[in-house]
Design a protein with these regions (language model features):
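A short SAM/SAH-binding and catalytic strip from SAM-dependent methyltransferases
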Residues: 213-226
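N-terminal helix-turn-helix DNA-binding core of bacterial DNA-binding proteins
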Residues: 2-40, 62-71, 136-138
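Amphipathic alpha-helical dimerization/coiled-coil segments
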Residues: 72-122
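Class I SAM-dependent methyltransferase SAM/SAH-binding core
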Residues: 148-150, 156-204
Length: 318
């Protein structure tokens, strides 16, 4: 408690905490907001991290920070800011500059996504409409409420937008810094609260065992050489009785997806999914299938699999 009070008591650190409670920010973004320049910002961030009030998240050549999500740190910050006047002039100016930084982030995301839009649209045209698939996902998961939802390979953050309103906490991971930029911008623009993203590998996610109620793996497995490892990680982090939802293509023969779009596997066979799930203590149901658009010769069937973690899961795949 004393260390936390000492760390939060410095004015610049208090401003940093106020900003990070609103959204995750890189060091560069914090510098843009905290005018004039704060040469001791790295020292402040180190002290806040050591006190358990912020979390450090490396992301390629970037480092992002967020307000603590741990039970002690979060409770301390909630209590601290409940006593502060958010209309205090300096905090209000910071909030206004944060909006400007967020607008710049959105422009960066739009520029990146415009470069891949043609590819994205071409793939979308090959399969069943996304809105209907998303409706089926929510139906299969149930309306919650969920304690914690995790999205493996979050991409644009669409699954977080869909499920965050049904959860106390929702978090997505992705290897791509560019896609995380897109996801952050989308979540901010859509006003999605309680959802965060961070860089991570779906085969070694930064979450504790038995900590999630729902894990989603949406159109990720066909990019992997060992999809079973992502399924094993999902089982590890799921609570007993927790659900895993997987969306991916049924087996197909569209070789151009491998050559031009980096698909490692041409769809996922239910038989393989069943084996991988059983190996890590997941009870897998038959998939719900969505055929390609009528008249689409080179269309793709999309499957949604639902699995539930057994009360006594088997050992995980190494």
């Amino acid at each position: 408690m004393i260390e936390a009070l000492r760390a939060a008591g410095e004015p610049t650190r208090l401003r940093v905490l106020a900003l990070l409670r609103q959204r995750d920010l890189s060091v560069g973004e914090l510098v843009q907001v905290l005018e004039p320049a704060q040469p001791r910002l790295p020292h402040h961030l180190k002290a806040l991290t050591a006190a358990g009030l912020v979390e450090r998240m490396p992301e390629g050549s970037f480092v992002f920070y967020r307000a603590s999500t741990g039970s002690y740190g979060k409770a301390f910050l909630d209590s601290l800011f409940a006593q502060l006047d958010r209309d205090e002039p300096e905090l209000a100016r910071d909030a206004a500059r944060l909006d400007e930084v967020s607008a710049a982030r959105a422009e960066s995301a739009e520029a990146y996504f415009s470069n891949i839009a043609e590819t994205w649209d071409r793939l979308r045209s090959l399969h069943y409409p996304n809105d209907l698939i998303e409706g089926a996902l929510v139906e299969l998961a149930g309306m919650g409420p969920f304690g914690r939802v995790l999205d493996f390979g979050t991409g644009t953050g669409r699954m977080l937008s869909l499920f965050a309103p049904l959860a106390e906490e929702a978090e997505g991971i992705d290897l791509s810094h560019h896609m995380l930029t897109v996801a952050r911008a989308n979540l901010e623009q859509q006003g999605v609260h309680g959802a965060r993203v961070r860089q991570g590998n779906v085969t070694a996610v930064p979450f504790d065992d038995n900590s999630a109620d729902l894990v989603i793996i949406h159109q990720v497995l066909h990019y992997m050489d060992a999809p079973n490892r992502a399924i094993a990680e999902a089982s590890r982090v799921l609570k007993p009785g927790g659900q895993l939802l997987i969306v991916d293509f049924a087996p197909h023969d569209l070789e151009f997806l491998r050559a031009e779009y980096g698909h490692h596997r041409l769809g996922m066979a239910h038989e393989a999914m069943a084996v991988w799930s059983a190996d890590v203590g997941l009870d897998l149901f038959e998939p719900r299938s969505f055929a390609p658009p009528e008249g689409e010769q080179d269309g793709l069937t999309v499957n949604i699999w639902k699995a539930v973690k057994s009360a006594k899961p088997k050992e995980h795949v190494a």
